[in-house]
């Protein structure tokens, strides 16, 4: 099932596109702008396919009822994964719908604070959490807290890109292990691959 999507020269497309993506500075923070994390400048199907196949290769999708992500950039990932695995997905939204059983949870990241709202999860659901980037861990902690309140069983957690200490923070605070496809940093205005 796993398809290798090489960019040429034997490198995987995700790593190649990360190394060449633009960097913008906001305050003291350097943001990398990448199709998987931002949807700009353009999301190529072969990149999305590669990322989905790599997630499927490392993930535990046996007996999973639902995939879970937070809006916005996890949406293309869970949509693609759902098409490959036939597992439905749930999106934690930034907007309240006031549906019965809706679970609000506070989210604090390096750049924003606010509420996320979980719908569509039932007690006992076996879920896999998917996200595009883990950096501070704030979004992931919010997702985990909401799923625990709903009574879901978290089978696996996979983020495409790891940056900073968020993975370690989430693992220490929640006890859940997080898998990532690539670890990066921004050094001298460029993305550096620390681990792939």
From Swiss-Prot:
It catalyses: IMP + diphosphate = hypoxanthine + 5-phospho-alpha-D-ribose 1-diphosphate; GMP + diphosphate = guanine + 5-phospho-alpha-D-ribose 1-diphosphate. Keywords: Cytoplasm, Glycosyltransferase, Purine salvage, Transferase. One of its GO terms (biological process) is IMP salvage. HAMAP family: Hypx_phosphoribosyltr (MF_01467). CDD domains: PRTases_typeI (cd06223). Homodimer. One of its GO terms (molecular function) is hypoxanthine phosphoribosyltransferase activity. Its EC number is 2.4.2.8. This is Hypoxanthine/guanine phosphoribosyltransferase. It is found in: Cytoplasm. Belongs to the purine/pyrimidine phosphoribosyltransferase family. Archaeal HPRT subfamily. Catalyzes a salvage reaction resulting in the formation of IMP that is energically less costly than de novo synthesis.
